[in-house]
Amino acid sequence: MSEQTPAEAGAAGAREDACRDYQSSLEDLTFNSKPHINMLTILAEENLPFAKEIVSLIEAQTAKAPSSEKLPVMYLMDSIVKNVGREYLTAFTKNLVATFICVFEKVDENTRKSLFKLRSTWDEIFPLKKLYALDVRVNSLDPAWPIKPLPPNVNTSSIHVNPKFLNKSPDEPSTPGTVVSSPSISTPPIVPDIQKNLTQEQLIRQQLLAKQKQLLELQQKKLELELEQAKAQLAVSLSVQQETANLGPGSVPSKLHVPQIPTMAVKTPHQVPVQPDKSRAGPSLQMQDLKGTNRDPRLNRMSQHSSHGKEQSHRKEFVMNTINQSDIKTSKNVPSEKLNSSKQEKSKSGERITKKELDQLDSKSKSKSKSPSPLKNKLSHTKDLKNQDSESMRLSDMSKRDPRLKKHLQDKAEGKDEDVKEKRKTAEKKEKDEHMKSSEHRVIGSRSKIINGIVQKQDMVTEELEKQGTKPGRSSTRKRSRSRSPKSRSPIIHSPKRRDRRSPKRRQRSMSPNLAPKAGKMRQSGLKQSHMEEFPPPSREERNIKRSAKQDVRDPRRLKKMDEDRPQETAGQHSMKSGGDPKENIENWQSSKSAKRWKSGWEENKSLQQGDEHSKPPHLRHRESWSSTKGILSPRAPKQQHRLSVDANLQIPKELTLASKRELLQKTSERLASGEITQDEFLVVVHQIRQLFQYQEGVREEQRSPFNDRFPLKRPRYEDSDKPFVDGPASRFAGLDTNQRLTALAEDRPLFDGPGRPSVTRDGPAKMIFEGPNKLSPRIDGPPTPGSLRFDGSPGQMGGGGPMRFEGPQGQLGGGCPLRFEGPPGPVGTPLRFEGPIGQGGGGGFRFEGSPSLRFEGSTGGLRFEGPGGQPVGGLRFEGHRGQPVGGLRFEGPHGQPVGSLRFDNPRGQPVGGLRFEGGHGPSGAAIRFDGPHGQPGGGGGIRFEGPLLQQGVGMRFEGPHGQSVAGLRFEGHNQLGGNLRFEGPHGQPGVGIRFEGPIVQQGGGMRFEGPVPGGGLRIEGPLGQGGPRFEGCHSLRFDGQPGQPSLLPRFDGLHGQPGPRFERTGQPGPQRFDGPPGQQVQPRFDGVPQRFDGPQHQQASRFDIPLGLQGTRFDNHPSQRIESFNHSGPYNDPPGNTFNVPSQGLQFQRHEQIFDTPQGPNFNGPHGPGNQNFPNPINRASGHYFDEKNLQSSQFGNFGNLPTPISVGNIQASQQVLTGVAQPVAFGQGQQFLPVHPQNPGAFIQNPSGGLPKAYPDNHLSQVDVNELFSKLLKTGILKLSQPDSATAQVTEAVAQPPPEEDEDQNEDQDVPDLTNFTIEELKQRYDSVINRLYTGIQCYSCGMRFTTSQTDVYADHLDWHYRQNRTEKDVSRKVTHRRWYYSLTDWIEFEEIADLEERAKSQFFEKVHEEVVLKTQEAAKEKEFQSVPAGPAGAVESCEICQEQFEQYWDEEEEEWHLKNAIRVDGKIYHPSCYEDYQNTSSFDCTPSPSKTPVENPLNIMLNIVKNELQEPCESPKVKEEQIDAPPACSEESVATPTEIKTESDTVESV
């Protein structure tokens, strides 16, 4: 066993990893990326052993992907099938039709063209029958889609005469006789009709007809011979047939039809009505004959390939009529066809039949001529063929459907054919009515006939369906087959059908009914088909879900995955679907009710409440059992039974959680081999390891599947529920166990299919699993909505995976399932299991079952997470009624209590159990009351979901017990309005945490685990210590509850009520004060700074400082104790008792927070606040509960430990654990007194070291003791390394230590990176978390992505410098055209690389040299550019200096990419040479150019001289320069002066004027 287990576990782990990896990669395939598709194809090939799971993933992705992203997934499927094949080909073939239709329906026309091209490449890959079925289905959606006929060797409808028809023929004779006479009469008219049709069709088929002429002539001769023989036979059999005819109408019961259908049907048609009708109207007969031919099953055979798909939609409507008519017509046609056939052949009526068909005709005609009766079947076939030929008109209709003819016919003949058809229809309808009257019985017979003859040949699928289906199913199949066979039967019908088809079909598409008729019927008929075909419908639903989900989803990522999964949308969809075609759904074998609504997973869950479970289709039921086998427990079957029973508070040290089972077993074997451990020890350790991992695996599975269950849904199933949670490192919900999930998926589909789907939840209805395996934080994965809350994490579990599992239907929300917090079992982390119905709306409260775990039994309607109630929020809402809106986590009370406090009844009251959300009082504070064992002194203090749930950290603390401090999440106030508890902290897990924000509704409403919890988990240290979760400071989770509370600590602020209280705790440095937000005091709010339970309390701020002792004590053991204590944990002990109303103190859940100001700590003096509880200092012992003495006292609180959280309090002392007090609120309920712990025990709690908790559990149960024992053994033998020193306390708090261990473990993991340098394929294929973690740890270079550990900061700095140099060089070099030496020396090559070594770097001057060169070049360029330039004006413009009038030189500026004027500047729109402008400025400063305003009369020269004099006086430039300027260009100056003078004059004139 021990050896197999590891192997099996390894295989399961490999499967999960493979599926998880593939799923994540597949989700990135959002567009047609060939490299990505190639990569996924290679990955699929590498994971060939998991082909089924991967195929399920791909099909699920196809279903849930947006319409724009479906085609790439189809290309991926195509790539895998063509390049890998093998198992993948088989797996994809199974659901090929459903998958293809699912995509085809949702995409636009362009994508459909791509799909057609894709389909055209599959002829050599997929089975032809499968492709034919696919074509038929698609054709029913899009009549333009060609149906590729099956080759003769594959096609069931071969030309041979069907022996069944031959058997029938003897009965048919009478009709033939009559028919014969009528045919002669009708033949002439038929010919003209045929000719007309031919003229229409000939345009399209002239070439074909020419080729067929010879064949037709030969066939004619054969037919003539056959006709003679047939006449002789008919004469012989006429008497017999007549007798049968007489009997036929009345005597042919539908029952007979089923067995004898062929014969009876044939007889019937020929018998009574046929003759009279024929005799009555030759022309009408002709029409009928033509029509009949189309309807004739035999004709269909020939044309079935082409027209199959198209006709199907129409068939339904016309099935009855067509069948009757076809039967009648066939009889008529037989004789008429014979005559016509010869004429037609002669006239070469362009039978659309190809040579192949012609041959068929020949054989048929032969059979016809041979004997109308026996051959009649044959004849009917031949007739059909002939009629097809003769009825080229009809054929044209058919041809439209027939891919071969379609091309030509569609454009040219369609309009004509339509008109003709219309006319024929009217005539046919009349005839039909007549025939119907006479052949109602026949109709049935004909149907069966068709089924036997045509259907068999035409559609293997139909046959299978018939075989599989019961009579009801059969009727539906018949209808289908009929509709198929009628393809060619009635052109008239066809055209109308076609039209109807489109609109109705579309309608159907949009509605589930559509599925119901086709997919539904098929499913009904056969489960196997249902699996295949049902898939598509689910996929559609999933898509719809996606859409709606997208809107709902809070987290984009989750939206993406979860929503699609989400059943919610299904609700809407259901309504649409159900509205669409209830009839069709009814056909489904499931109860019509369930059938009508194609329920999405969660809806189904709801229906479960109604008892739909009973109506679940077998496969659903099967699925449930299946899922349970996976380890998902159904809500009813406690997980403990499935797996080991586990302590509710079970906490698994992080080292164990992170350790690889394989590695542990390997190392253990090595120790055994080296003699370090004995064989007995080896066996014990291996057994314990196996149990531990089995438990963890089970929890994961449970989480997943339940989770999925809830939403039955497809999506979820397909998807991992994990995905969403990938967030927390650990969180990763169950890790998804994708495989599991996938498997489930497969099972699920049927659900989708079946109307029965109803019970969606496979598992129980949804179980909520708070799995979080490792993660601490619980994450509510749920599809969330539907309420399922999944605490992934053990929630509390910090370390441990202890997942909490809300097993309940959870998803159900309303579902009748109870929610089950499985609790301990939860892995180590003790998951909480709400067993109760949880979602149920009323039904069944939840039950926290875990043994250890608490079982909230309460009637309460279960808590509803989010539930339908849905408060979206997400919080978890124990809604109780479900209905309750309230939200907060409200354990609603049995139902309703609005407040709904919920009562967790602990079934056993056991202490543990204790938590009972009584709900009753709900009202009052609505607090939840943990009735719990109530008395238990610490009794678990209320529910504290500490244990399991919160489990300390995470847990929510129900105040009562949860009083625990922080620890649990306390749903304390949950009612409080504030109420929401927000586990901010840990849970947050780091961010992951669950945030029960939602339900919350309550304002605070849900609890939100906001904090990141550093450790990832929350670390409520205090409360549970839980392993850790320690509210350690920030980490800790902060129950923000109120949300307001900022402090990390968990502040149960919001919870109000609970957290209302803030244990500020004086205790430590600061008094603890429960500050109620509301002032009410009542609520204690652990505000305080929230002290962090960091230090031993100290931390004054630490808000629960002590309470949990947190700090101080870390409840190390809590973890271990954890839930257990839960029950009792001291303080909370009573929680149960506590009504949780408010915590005792007033913590009522009122929201008010009571402020326990009391510095003293724990005494919560605070007003008792409304809460009933008085908390009055509970601690004070005052009332409140008292900590179980035992606990209390024990200083250890150890027991408290049990309490876990409260215990944490270890430090309590001072703080006294306010928590206890506070939490205690419960107490009063219990009546237990709160013994205040008083600091006196402050530390006490702490103790309980890990061990304590366990209290004795059954042997089969995986208790904390077992885990601790195993952990200590592994540490002792060196198999596991402690991430941090394991002091006694540490051991006690293994779980507690977990948070820090997480960090240490990360380091250890890095150190434990396996040596893969031997490159062994098997090893490289394994997933090593340590390797992956290594890839994501350290400082990452923003430029190249390299990572540097914290010890490599210097190297990182040098690395950044190197990037800078490289970037600078590249930038500089890019400015100039550069060259390189012909030969690069080794040093040059090396210099291109980053060199960290200082000495080497000193030698690496390559870039510096290049830089210098670049600098020189740029400097030269700068010199060249020292001249100023301005953009040139428009091309062709002559631009010159305003001063010297010299034309500027133009050049092309590379940087600006435009022509510039060299050595120029532009000033006020004028361009100058810089030197000219400089001179101009200098002179202008002297007013060298008199301004017009001055109108000087003096000679400009004098003016200039004066200026120069002035300039000389002012130390300016030397007079020489000035003189030079003036003298050098005297003429110029004079001219310039003159000009100005003139200007002045003018100006003067102007002015004077």
UniProtKB/Swiss-Prot annotation:
The modification N-acetylserine is found at S2. Its main location: nucleus. GO terms for molecular function: mRNA binding; RNA polymerase II complex binding. Residues 14-142 form the CID domain. Keywords: Acetylation, Coiled coil, Isopeptide bond, Methylation, mRNA processing, Nucleus, Phosphoprotein, Ubl conjugation. Residues 174-186 have a biased composition (Low complexity). Residues 308-318, 343-365, 381-422, 428-443, 530-568, 600-616, 716-725 have a biased composition (Basic and acidic residues). Residues 1301-1313 have a biased composition (Acidic residues). Residues 476-487, 495-509 have a biased composition (Basic residues). The modification Asymmetric dimethylarginine is found at R805, R820, R833, R929, R944, R957, R982, R995, R1008, R1092, R1103. There is a cross-link at K291, K329, K457, K654, K723, K1276, K1417, K1509, K1522, K1544 (Glycyl lysine isopeptide (Lys-Gly) (interchain with G-Cter in SUMO2)). Residues 208-235 form a coiled coil. The modification Phosphothreonine is found at T121, T785. Residues 167-186, 265-648, 707-733, 921-940, 1286-1313, 1516-1553 are annotated as: Disordered. The keyword Phosphoprotein applies. Signal peptide: none annotated. It comes from the Eukaryota. The keyword Coiled coil applies. It is found in: Nucleus. GO terms for cellular component: mitochondrion; mRNA cleavage factor complex; nucleoplasm; nucleus. The modification Phosphoserine is found at S120, S169, S182, S490, S495, S510, S512, S645, S705, S777, S794, S851. GO terms for biological process: mRNA 3'-end processing; termination of RNA polymerase II transcription. PANTHER family: PRE-MRNA CLEAVAGE COMPLEX 2 PROTEIN PCF11 (PTHR15921:SF3), PRE-MRNA CLEAVAGE COMPLEX II (PTHR15921). Component of pre-mRNA cleavage complex II, which promotes transcription termination by RNA polymerase II. Associates with the phosphorylated CTD domain of POLR2A /RNA polymerase II. This is Pre-mRNA cleavage complex 2 protein Pcf11. It comes from Mus musculus. The lineage of its organism: Eukaryota, Metazoa, Chordata, Craniata, Vertebrata.
